[in-house]
């Protein structure tokens, strides 16, 4: 039971009147305070929003490359990558004393086609895989025709086949591409003439984003049996294959009607792997560093090393030797009018020989379509070999012999290689060594640094020395009569 409580109101002493502000001044002060708070809030939101916007723009332009500090590398690739050098040796070209026996390009291509399960992306210059394309009746075209037949079987089996090809500037056979379209393949023509005043000169395949071929061989039956070619097939190397797919995706985008080169490529095309941060891979059981370069520079999204920069880096880092095998060598912009001198590579080779004492060997192709002006530039390089300066540069011309029937095959019987090897690095590309191929024309290269003997680098060195020491290599002062009419540079 609660006790009965009595409540009594407390008497609060009266306060003395204070000096109060007039009501209009109080309201003015409150309004000013409220306005100041709103201004402060707006300023804070503006700063935060600006910071968020700049961060987004930063990431959009540079992708996630800048998540890595200057001394950090992307995570290594743990795929068991296997690299195999493949060659096309023209019929009748024999190396009786050579110990190197590499798989043929056609064997490699047919093997890749047989193993394709989900996708095949091909970047190509042109397509002439059959006798009908070249108006010939050559038995040696059989290998190219078989490649085309196998390509036509893929799309009906559920393989997504995409082909990016250079848009021709004039009449060019289209029967192969039409046959592939009818089989279910997708084809896009890239108008490099409109985009950069060049062509799509790239030659690579990507299979299931796991395996790839990259090299000098075109989609041409002659590239399998009548032209000397070199390339590399990478098996079980999805890290590199996916990165090569990014280069293909850029071509695929540019193959759309009305497309243009973006001023800034979207992040989708960016790469983490380049000259500064190459991919760490296990290649043929040995640690290696690798990355893919591309040309021309406008086709290089954030992170992608331009092809010329990659090539010059190999030259500049050589300390013992530089061996180069390439079809054309011209320190000019040969397809520009008027012609321009373009000494970027030439300067690098001369500097390597003169300043660092590097042994330089150039094996340049010579055939009926060689640019005559090459001879003067090659003689200039060879003239640096001198006992007083101790510069050691040698130049030879590689001539593929042809009998009467072989000589009638159009645009055949030539060494079409495009590679370089040093004591440190391997460079396998798709471009000739003259200016326009790096400034206007689309090309791709694979760069690998690997220590030790028995790796990709030493295998490529062995191929170069086999060719250099062969009876098909000739000094610049060789009599033209000794090689017949096959060479325009003697």
Swiss-Prot record:
E.C. number: 3.1.16.1, 3.1.4.-
Primary subcellular site in the record, as a coarse category: endoplasmic reticulum
Membrane-side (Lumenal) residue stretches: 60-490
InterPro entries per record: Diverse_PLD-related (IPR050874), PLDc_3 (IPR032803), PLipase_D/transphosphatidylase (IPR001736)
Positions of Mg(2+) binding: 438
Substrates-to-products reaction catalysed: Exonucleolytic cleavage in the 5'- to 3'-direction to yield nucleoside 3'-phosphates; a 5'-end 5'-dephospho-ribonucleotidyl-ribonucleotide-RNA + H2O = a ribonucleoside 3'-phosphate + a 5'-end dephospho-ribonucleoside-RNA + H(+); a ribonucleoside 3'-phosphate-2'-3'-cyclophospho-GMP + H2O = a ribonucleoside 3'-phosphate + 2',3'-cyclophospho-GMP + H(+); a 5'-end 5'-dephospho-2'-deoxyribonucleotidyl-2'-deoxyribonucleotide in single-stranded DNA + H2O = a 5'-end dephospho-2'-deoxyribonucleoside in single-stranded DNA + a 2'-deoxyribonucleoside 3'-phosphate + H(+)
Residues that coordinate or bind phosphate: 201, 203, 218, 416
Keywords, sorted A to Z: Disulfide bond, Endoplasmic reticulum, Endosome, Exonuclease, Glycoprotein, Golgi apparatus, Hydrolase, Immunity, Inflammatory response, Lipid metabolism, Lysosome, Magnesium, Membrane, Metal-binding, Nuclease, Phospholipid metabolism, Repeat, Signal-anchor, Transmembrane, Transmembrane helix, Ubl conjugation
Example GO BP: immune system process
Subcellular location(s) per record: Endoplasmic reticulum membrane; Lysosome lumen; Early endosome membrane; Late endosome membrane
Record comment regarding domains: The catalytic domain contains two conserved PLD phosphodiesterase HxK(x4)D(E) motifs that accomodate the phosphate group of the nucleic acid substrates, with one nucleophile histidine residue forming a phosphohistidine intermediate and the other histidine protonating the leaving 5'-OH ssDNA/RNA fragment, resulting in the cleavage of the phosphodiester bond. The homodimer has two independent catalytic domains arranged at the dimer interface.
Protein name: 5'-3' exonuclease PLD3
